Amino acid sequence: MANLIPAVADMGPVWLATLIFGRDASLAVAAIYYRWASLPAPKTLARYWDFSLPSAEVHPTTVSKYNTFLQLILVGGTTALPLLSAHSELLPAKLTFEGVVRGLQYVVAATTLWSGASYAWLKNAVKILGENEELKAKQGKRGRAIIGVSFATIVVLAVFLAQREDKVEQDPRHEV
């Protein structure tokens, strides 16, 4: 999904692409940590890439699955928007395909925020394998902190980009 978002970024808001891609990047950074932290000794790069040595299991959250579904609908709708806009008479009065896609963008933004937060807060999203419960709890807490801090940084960046985009829309002469 993350590969499709930059491809349509010029057809949609950059802040939303940043939010979606940033959530995925936050999860990827945390996955790197989880793998390294939970890998049994000795920790080597060869063992890191040896997936016959499982050390953690990721369980996608329900909201994350809905978010992916909504992202696919958004990408499809955004891609089809030029074609659909030519036939706006198919919609009831005061409703446009652009408005529908805009509304879907906000829904996707909300579910992306919810999804990112769920990985940061839910303890059952990642199960670290092993027998030392105290160590597993510590590694899980650090991994969720990595997701939380990195995703919060992305959210701040997305808000900044949204405000900047809003200023440009209000005043086209505004320099970016």
Listing of model-derived features with the role each one plays in the protein:
Residues 1-36:
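Multi-pass membrane catalytic core of lipid/isoprenoid biosynthesis enzymes
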Residues 34-176:
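C-terminal membrane-associated helical module and adjoining short loops/tails
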